[in-house]
Amino acid sequence: FSGEAISLMAKYTGASLSEAEADLHQHLGVCLDLCHAAVEFEDPDQAICALQNAGIAIPKVQISAGLRMPKVTQADLSRIRPFDDAVYLHQVVAKTVRGLDRYLDLGEAFAAYKESEEPEWRVHFHVPIFLADLDGFATTRPALETFLARQRSAPVTQHLEVETYTWDVLPAAHRGDDVV
């Protein structure tokens, strides 16, 4: 934690600086959302190591997967438009030869798209974790599988949560399957 964060904690709690730092480490941590990490092209192992090396606790991991489009085409844009709902923002990270371009929502990514760049898109749209692909799109499930392998051999946390809040805004064709 930064010196400023430690000082503020000490000021607001009346604790010494060393007590405030210990309290921050004991009570604050990061909820690692695997969909967000994968959309950002982060490797789960590297993200976990970076947090642990910084002394930041990971009290909860959200088990989730997003959409992955390895080389976006005009046809892909037509197929993904039904996922562009008005309820949630679906951040997009596009990987091009220049690096990573970030868009707050699908509409911004549609407007910026250039087929000649052959970008890979990762879209923060939670999809069923048991699917390797959805409607011809790949998913970020491989990142989830990497994390679960690590979790089996060296547990990161005891609190795993499957995050599925976008189930109701999935295109209707993908909401009908029972998972039980």
Question: What residue spans do the PLM features occupy?
Answer:
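Acidic/histidine-rich catalytic cores of soluble enzymes
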Residues: 1-119, 127
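Flexible, acidic glycine-rich loops studded with aromatic residues
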Residues: 57, 104-180
